[in-house]
Amino acid sequence: MIQMVPIYSCSALLRRTIPKRPFYHVLSGLTVRFKVNPQLNYNLFRDLTRREYATNPSKTPHIKSKLLNIPNILTLSRIGCTPFIGLFIITNNLTPALGLFAFSSITDFMDGYIARKYGLKTIAGTILDPLADKLLMITTTLALSVPSGPQIIPVSIAAIILGRDVLLAISALFIRYSTLKLKYPGRVAWNSYWDIVRYPSAEVRPSQLSKWNTFFQMVYLGSGVLLLLYEKEEGCEKTEEDFEDRKQDFQKAFSYLGYVTATTTIMSGVSYALKRNAFKLLK
């Protein structure tokens, strides 16, 4: 009995090195006797191994994704905080909203740093991290711009931020489907589509411009929550004579920061559209 490795993980020269005499292979307890013809050996062996690893994804040697490590736990905690941030902003509970937003911003830096420094980078992390960023940006932008809320962000800037993230989300869903179909033929189903741990198909590669854009968006949205909190606290005290002057200065700086953020958002969206290696197909 001879135990062989999957055909798709071997060199292309394997086709010419398959012996010209009968040999055997064991898959799931089934002994298969190969033909003498090398080409038939290659085709039969390829089909059997692909079928074996498609029906038993846990055996696939390329799965390197692990969900529960420290960086991914930080990312998941950021996702869990996101709906509460939006709720607190809408209900004018600005102190906990600012605290959770600051926590989310810090963990966004920490998870990537820990993953790179300690070799904990995973396929799941490359997908969950930008997903957490998009959820945080979309939720906070909506909460700060809807008419029923404080509406401190202009509609034009909110439309730019939301439009880019929605388009990226749609493209990510399409890329996930197409790469899953290529990597796991016949295994594209609802459960496998959302199971990025057992069925990883692509790795997200954000550009440096995208990282800077995320930074500016976090500073801009965090400043919006801070401005609302400042107006609320100072408005209640009404002890400072120059309150209105400081408020106008703060609002002016916030407006300029909004223009910068809108510019980087547009540039980042264009770079994603033109960049060919924003997503890497896993082999």
Curated annotation (Swiss-Prot):
It comes from the Eukaryota. Keywords: Lipid biosynthesis, Lipid metabolism, Membrane, Mitochondrion, Mitochondrion inner membrane, Phospholipid biosynthesis, Phospholipid metabolism, Transferase, Transmembrane, Transmembrane helix. It is an enzyme of class 2 (transferase). GO terms for biological process: cardiolipin biosynthetic process; intracellular monoatomic ion homeostasis; lipid biosynthetic process; mitochondrial genome maintenance; mitochondrial membrane organization; phospholipid metabolic process; protein targeting to membrane. This is Cardiolipin synthase (CMP-forming). It catalyses: a CDP-1,2-diacyl-sn-glycerol + a 1,2-diacyl-sn-glycero-3-phospho-(1'-sn-glycerol) = a cardiolipin + CMP + H(+). It is a multi-pass membrane protein. GO terms for cellular component: mitochondrial inner membrane; mitochondrion. Disruption phenotype: Cardiolipin absent from cells. Decreases cell population growth during growth on the non-fermentable carbon source ethanol. Sensitive to thermal stress. Its EC number is 2.7.8.41. Belongs to the CDP-alcohol phosphatidyltransferase class-I family. InterPro entries: CDP-alcohol_PTase-I, CDP-OH_P_trans, CDP-OH_PTrfase_TM_dom, CDP_ALCOHOL_P_TRANSF_CS. It is found in: Mitochondrion inner membrane. Pfam families: CDP-OH_P_transf (PF01066). Optimum temperature is 45 degrees Celsius. Present with 876 molecules/cell in log phase SD medium. Optimum pH is 9. Catalyzes the synthesis of cardiolipin (CL) (diphosphatidylglycerol) by specifically transferring a phosphatidyl group from CDP-diacylglycerol to phosphatidylglycerol (PG). CL is a key phospholipid in mitochondrial membranes and plays important roles in maintaining the functional integrity and dynamics of mitochondria under both optimal and stress conditions. May be found in a large complex. The chain crosses the membrane at residues 83-103, 155-175, 209-229. Its cofactor is Mg(2+). One of its GO terms (molecular function) is cardiolipin synthase (CMP-forming).
